[in-house]
């Protein structure tokens, strides 16, 4: 009986893991008034339509995957800014109606135009005065976490979801230049509190 219950719970957990996790990446350049041209590679994309002022939608993008499974996959989208400057790239999981149905995603690395961004493999870290570990050049909100061995082949990774996102700033992006932003991701379990 215990074995049957254990197998049933494992099956439910695996289904929940795959059913709820969809990686999402947002860029918002409203403050900079930097119009973005966005092209889908293997992610769906749109503007940030939840922003009420439709006139600023052209300064935003949101790209997301379909449901992720337990295998690592590489996903990407391409953005071209109309002005030179910094571009903030947010990494999260897709929104769901309730917090407990918002899945979690592991991000193994981030590349731009085929090159690993500075510390895009999350190897270098720093610790806040509160003791939270962050990958150098990245910011982790709330319960987003650095996982030293959570990546592909035991490398470092970050764990994110919709309310607990990771952030990276592409510095000095050039106007009119296309930037293909690539992530290696997979579905993950929620962190232990």
Language model: regions and residue ranges:
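A ubiquitous, low-specificity "background" feature that marks scattered single residues
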Residues: 8-9, 114
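Sec-dependent signal peptide recognition
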Residues: 2-8
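Hydrophobic h-region of N-terminal signal peptides that target proteins for export
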Residues: 10-17
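Extracellular and organelle-lumenal recognition/adhesion modules and their flexible linkers in secreted
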Residues: 20-193
């Amino acid at each position: 009986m215990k074995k049957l219950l254990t197998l049933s719970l494992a099956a439910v957990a695996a289904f929940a893991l795959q059913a709820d996790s969809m990686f999402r990446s947002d860029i918002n350049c409203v403050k900079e008034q930097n119009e973005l041209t966005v092209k889908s590679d293997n992610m769906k994309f749109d503007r940030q339509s939840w922003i009420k002022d439709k006139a600023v939608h052209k300064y935003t993008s949101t790209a997301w995957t379909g449901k992720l499974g337990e295998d690592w996959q590489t996903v990407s989208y391409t953005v071209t800014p109309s002005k030179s400057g910094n571009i903030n790239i947010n990494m999260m999981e897709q929104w769901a109606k309730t917090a407990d149905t918002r899945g979690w995603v592991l991000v193994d690395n981030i590349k731009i135009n085929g090159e690993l961004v500075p510390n895009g493999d999350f190897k270098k870290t720093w610790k806040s005065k509160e003791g939270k570990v962050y990958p150098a050049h990245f910011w982790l909100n709330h319960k987003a976490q650095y996982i030293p061995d959570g990546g592909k082949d035991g490398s470092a990774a970050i764990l994110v979801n919709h309310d607990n996102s990771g952030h990276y700033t592409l510095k000095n992006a050039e106007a009119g230049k296309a930037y293909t932003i690539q992530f290696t991701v997979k579905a993950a379990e929620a962190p232990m509190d």
